[in-house]
UniProtKB/Swiss-Prot annotation:
Protein name per the record: Transcriptional regulator prz1
Location of region: Disordered: 1-29, 66-96, 340-372, 410-433, 520-563, 662-681
Gene Ontology biological-process annotations: calcineurin-mediated signaling; calcium-mediated signaling; cellular response to calcium ion; intracellular calcium ion homeostasis; regulation of transcription by RNA polymerase II
Modified residues (Phosphoserine): 543, 546
Compositionally biased region (Basic and acidic residues): 1-15
Organism: Schizosaccharomyces pombe (strain 972 / ATCC 24843) (Fission yeast)
Biological role stated in the UniProt entry: Involved in the regulation of calcium ion homeostasis. Binds to the calcineurin-dependent response element. Transcriptionally regulates pmc1.
GO molecular function per UniProt: 14-3-3 protein binding; DNA-binding transcription activator activity, RNA polymerase II-specific; RNA polymerase II cis-regulatory region sequence-specific DNA binding; zinc ion binding
Modification after translation (UniProt): Phosphorylated. Dephosphorylated by calcineurin which leads to rapid translocation from the cytoplasm to the nucleus.
Family according to the record: Belongs to the EGR C2H2-type zinc-finger protein family.
UniProt entry tagged with the keyword Transcription regulation: yes
Organism phylogeny: Eukaryota, Fungi, Dikarya, Ascomycota, Taphrinomycotina
Any single GO CC term annotated in Swiss-Prot or TrEMBL for this entry: cytoplasm
Length: 681
């Protein structure tokens, strides 16, 4: 008889609309529905699963079974606030209940927003039977293993029919001490769940399994075992590993988010306790808090990823590309140290060694086995990385080196250089100040030079005329430069001015088609005749070598050499400026003043200068040190040019005369001023 009454009550309750149940309970006399009265009289409330979206909390059976109590405004005995249909479970305290009816929580859409993902439905503040103090006298902690105070009867309910499974979660096994469920990503049904089985299909003996399928809950982060409810000690555990595999689902929901970012992955695991690397969380423990979960076979869980349990130690990822990064350029005008193995970890030995097991150890990084392809499950990445510094240069344990294999690694000095530009013919650029195609070397000639064409000082006909270079000082050495990217003028070497008054024994200049100044002048102090020859690195169809001069005019050559040195071989070719310089560096610095190119900047006030020594003198003004003093009046100056201006003034002239009369030694740089003062007398 009791069984028949229970079946009849189940049939009636199955056809009852939950919203009408709430409407009837809200009436003071509870008389709105005779069907509800009949059901309530025949069935104990303890046999009815209660849902928070219907009653907002569990209602004591004494309040419902006694229709004379009209205190429906305060159904909950522990609060004075009337319940609301959208209330959360944490708004009410726990109280004694009867029976083994589990409590279910419903998370409304847009209940809570997750930072970075907008407003989405999230699983939060869920209630499980284990949180009831009457049923759980002992706190349930997954870290201590399955509690012995619970059995399978705690999770059985009367078969009362379908229960809107798509909006309920049966969260019986959330490990409150390990994971805060409010930090999960937005809840959504697994993509495969809607395709495998409809959400309205009841499964197994109870309809309170996760959404639609026993193996596909509505949250991709609550993955449970198929047979979880059949075993007394195997609860519906939270799958920690699914937080890593869940990115496959999230990548389709959030295509604009890079889920491969390690910082984003770790953000979703901030509440996982424990130490170790991220790979440690990808290894299912053999025992402990998740022991029951790991007992399930791979086919019984939705972890989304397989693991090679035989290889529990995964080497951390290594950024191998950074070991082959391009080193920073050292610009010409910047004071920098030698670019050597002490200052760069990127040098690779180039002494002809081959990559083999004798002189280099292979650095193997084992890849994680892919669950999608068995053919590549054992694939691994093998790289050869060389470090010429020392075995401790890269401290990662994956990379091992032998320092003896890299002794004598050459030091490299890097200077930026733009790609070479070939020319159709031997011609100068539009700006004659830029030297592009000159390569100079010295070699001895046994044949005499003869002939010297007359040349205009401002004309350059390289195809039809022989170019004769000026007499070079024995101490002159060509400066090696390379073209820098951009419109930097300091990367080019100005062409020495060409003259027509050279002797027949002067050196003759020849030009090739190279784009960089590659030549080096090797001076020979012997009295034999020298000439300049072209050393071209590319095939050439014509030779521009020419021999001019006459051996009989050696005396006039020496005279012209001394005159050229006194006058200056390097002349500024800007209109209206015919200044001469004895050094190419001085001419280049002077050209910067015309182009307004000031590469040297004060480190304090950021003022720019065309010459480096001007910048250094300027920086002394900031220090307040006045290192230059007059030998007579002891007036001090921060710069030498200021002291020289003092000596040229009327007061300074008197100081120099006084110093001469007193026999005070004047610095060598001041002798010229003293001599000029004496001549004026």
């Amino acid at each position: 008889m009791e069984r028949q009454r229970s079946e009849e009550a189940n049939r009636r309750f199955k056809d009852l609309n939950p919203s009408s149940l709430y409407d009837n309970l809200s009436k003071p006399d509870l008389g709105g529905s005779s069907e509800l009265h009949t059901y309530m009289n025949d069935t104990s409330l303890a046999d009815i699963p209660l849902f928070e979206d219907t009653l907002a909390s569990e209602v004591s059976s004494s309040l419902i079974s006694n229709p004379s109590k009209n205190n429906i405004q305060h159904l909950h005995p522990n609060t004075s606030e009337p319940f609301k249909t959208s209330s959360k479970s944490d708004e009410y305290d726990s109280y004694p209940r009867t029976g083994n009816v589990p409590t279910f929580s419903f998370t409304e859409l847009n209940d809570t927003s997750v930072s970075g993902f907008g407003s989405q439905a999230v699983f939060e503040n869920s209630v499980s039977p284990l949180s009831n103090p009457s049923n759980s006298p002992q706190a349930f902690d997954l870290t201590q293993g399955s509690s012995s105070t619970h059995n399978a009867n705690d999770f059985t309910v009367n078969n009362v029919g379908s229960r809107r499974q798509s909006i309920y979660e049966f969260n019986i096994g959330i490990p409150s001490s390990n994971i805060d469920s409010s930090q999960f990503l937005p809840v959504s049904r697994a993509i495969a769940a809607s395709e495998i089985s409809p959400s309205s299909s009841p499964q197994l003996l109870t309809s309170f399994l996760p959404s639609g399928s026993v193996s596909n809950p509505s949250s991709p982060y609550l993955q449970g075992s198929v047979g979880a409810l059949y075993e007394a000690d195997a609860f519906n555990f939270v799958d920690v590993m699914s937080q890593a595999s869940g990115t496959e689902v999230d990548s389709e929901r959030f295509p604009s988010v890079d889920f491969e970012d390690p910082s984003l992955l770790m953000e979703n695991q901030q509440n996982i306790t424990g130490t170790g690397s991220f790979a440690d969380y990808l290894q299912p423990p053999s025992s402990g808090s998740l022991g029951a979960f790991t007992n399930a076979s791979p086919g019984e869980s939705n972890t989304g990823i397989d693991f090679d349990t035989d290889n529990t130690n995964l080497n951390p990822s290594v950024d191998l590309l950074s070991n082959h990064s391009t080193p920073s350029f050292i610009f010409e005008n910047s004071p920098s140290a030698e670019f050597s193995h002490q200052s760069s970890p990127y040098l690779v030995p180039n002494s002809g060694r081959t990559l083999n097991s004798e002189n280099a150890r292979e650095s193997t990084i084992r890849s994680v086995n892919s669950p999608f392809s068995e053919d590549h499950a054992d694939a691994s990445l093998t790289t050869h990385v060389f470090d010429p510094i020392s075995p401790t240069a890269l401290s990662n344990s994956v990379l091992n080196y032998d320092s003896n294999n890299f002794s004598g690694t050459p030091q490299i000095n890097v200077v930026p250089s733009s790609p070479s530009k070939s020319q159709s013919g031997p011609s100068l650029p539009a700006n004659p100040l830029l030297q592009t195609d000159i390569s100079i070397t010295y070699s001895q000639s046994a044949s005499p030079v003869s002939g010297q064409p007359a040349m205009n000082e401002n004309s350059y006909d390289l195809q039809n005329a022989n170019l004769c270079a000026p007499e070079m000082s024995p101490t002159y050495t060509a400066r090696h430069r390379s073209n820098s990217a951009g419109s930097r003028f300091d990367a080019y070497e100005p062409i020495p001015q060409l003259y027509t008054h050279f002797s027949h024994s002067s050196e003759c200049l020849s030009v090739n088609q190279d784009t960089e100044l590659l030549g080096k002048i090797e001076n020979d102090n012997s009295k034999s005749n020298d000439y300049l020859s072209v050393r071209n690195t590319r095939p050439r169809s014509r030779s521009l070598n020419s021999l001019v001069g006459n051996k009989s005019e050696n005396s006039s050559s020496s005279k012209a050499k001394s005159e050229s040195k006194s006058q200056g071989n390097y002349v500024c070719t800007f209109a209206g400026c015919n200044k001469r310089f004895t050094r190419a560096y001085n001419l280049k610095s002077h050209m910067n003043t015309h182009t307004n190119y000031r590469p040297f900047q004060c480190s304090i006030c950021k003022k720019s200068f065309a010459r480096q020594h001007d910048k250094r003198r300027h920086e002394q003004l900031h220090t307040g040190i006045k290192a230059f003093a007059c030998v007579t009046c002891n007036q001090r100056f921060a710069r030498m040019d200021a002291l020289n201006r003092h000596y040229k003034s009327e007061v300074g002239q008197n100081c120099l005369r006084t110093a001469t009369e007193r026999g005070i030694q004047v610095p060598p740089s001041r002798k010229t001023a003293v001599a000029s003062t004496s001549k004026q007398k």
